[in-house]
A protein has these predicted regions:
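Catalytic machinery of carbohydrate-active enzymes
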Residues: 1-241
Length: 241
């Protein structure tokens, strides 16, 4: 088949749908959009501002917004009873991970969908909006070097283990509901301090050059099992107890 010729099939992909999962599967979704006429994915309503922004360049992608995982499963169940363009020809899904296989969850996802894991990084793409990014930089009002810090009330960082002199910029819901608005702040930061979250995936996949930037993953703050922890390419310093 000619590489530019797409399979005339409408395929629904279903994987886990935290924002971190959506970022991990960016490359996977883009590979499928190259192969098939139409691709559909689910998206939890709270993540829609970021997910719709991330894929706004794709003309053959449908985003099925759901409010819960129960609604997602119900949509899949009734797919066979739909007609025309509302029906997917095929549903490809990974509903559970094999905790005992010793295989990292990200590798299980990409293996399940038949996409090389390297595409997580190599095919990752988001069309950035520099105007929105600059608006965030102006909004935080920090001039000079700073550190980008992302943690969670459930998984707080030890503030003694981050710079005591650099100003802190943190992504909050009040700042923006779109994680990609923070790309400019991220790439310019002198230091990055994060736990296992959507932001560590975004930072690791986002292609930018900042040779003096120091990256710190505060693993002690969120002891994610090794199989579930995001696979990383960039030169992170892992902070443990």
């Amino acid at each position: 088949m000619n590489q530019k010729e797409k399979v005339k099939s409408i395929v629904l992909l279903d994987f886990h749908h935290g924002m971190g999962d959506e970022l991990i599967c960016n490359g996977l979704v883009r590979e499928y959009c190259k192969r098939y006429e139409t691709i559909g994915i689910f998206c939890l309503k709270r993540n829609y501002p970021s997910v719709s922004f991330m894929y706004r360049d794709l003309t053959n992608l449908r985003i099925q917004v759901v409010n819960s995982h129960t609604e997602r499963m119900r949509f899949r169940l009734f797919n066979a009873f739909r007609f025309g363009q509302n029906r997917y020809d095929e549903v490809r899904a990974i509903d559970a991970y094999d905790d005992e296989s010793g295989i990292r969850f990200e590798r299980q996802i990409y293996n399940k969908f038949g996409v090389p894991l390297e595409k997580k990084w190599d095919s990752f793409f988001v069309e950035r909006d520099r105007t929105r990014e600059e608006a965030i930089i102006k909004k935080v009002g920090v001039s000079g070097p700073y550190q980008f810090v992302h943690d969670d009330s459930r998984f707080p960082l030890d503030r003694a283990r981050i710079s005591q002199t650099l100003p802190i910029i943190q992504p909050t819901k009040e700042l923006t509901n779109n994680v990609f608005d923070c790309c400019g702040v991220i790439e310019r930061a002198a230091e990055i301090h994060v736990v296992d979250s959507s932001f560590i995936v975004l930072i690791d996949c986002l292609p930018y050059v900042n040779e003096t930037q120091r990256l710190y993953k505060h693993q002690y703050a969120r002891a994610t099992p090794a199989a579930q922890s995001p696979m990383l390419r960039k030169p992170w310093t892992i902070l443990t107890l």
